[in-house]
């Protein structure tokens, strides 16, 4: 389980996302 804050944040790449979130296919961090 990644430590990912549960906020809806748009992204283009993993580095756009906080914590250990990654950029998902739908264009949001998760």
From Swiss-Prot:
Keyword Disulfide bond part of the UniProt annotation: yes
Compartment(s) of residence: Secreted
Pfam families: Squash
One Gene Ontology term, aspect cellular component: extracellular region
Superkingdom to which the source organism belongs: Eukaryota
Disulfide bonds: 4-21, 11-23, 17-29
Gene Ontology molecular function, alphabetical: serine-type endopeptidase inhibitor activity
Record keyword Secreted present: yes
InterPro entries xref list: Prot_inh_squash, Proteinase_amylase_inhib_sf
Annotated keywords: Disulfide bond, Knottin, Protease inhibitor, Secreted, Serine protease inhibitor
Site note Reactive bond, residues: 6-7
Swiss-Prot/TrEMBL domain comment: The presence of a 'disulfide through disulfide knot' structurally defines this protein as a knottin.
Family under the similarity heading: Belongs to the protease inhibitor I7 (squash-type serine protease inhibitor) family.
Function: Inhibits trypsin.
Name of the protein in question: Trypsin inhibitor 1
Organism: Momordica charantia
Lineage: Eukaryota, Viridiplantae, Streptophyta, Embryophyta, Tracheophyta
């Amino acid at each position: 389980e990644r430590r990912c804050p549960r906020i809806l944040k748009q992204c283009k790449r993993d580095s756009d996302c906080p914590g250990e979130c990654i950029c998902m296919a739908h264009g949001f961090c998760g």
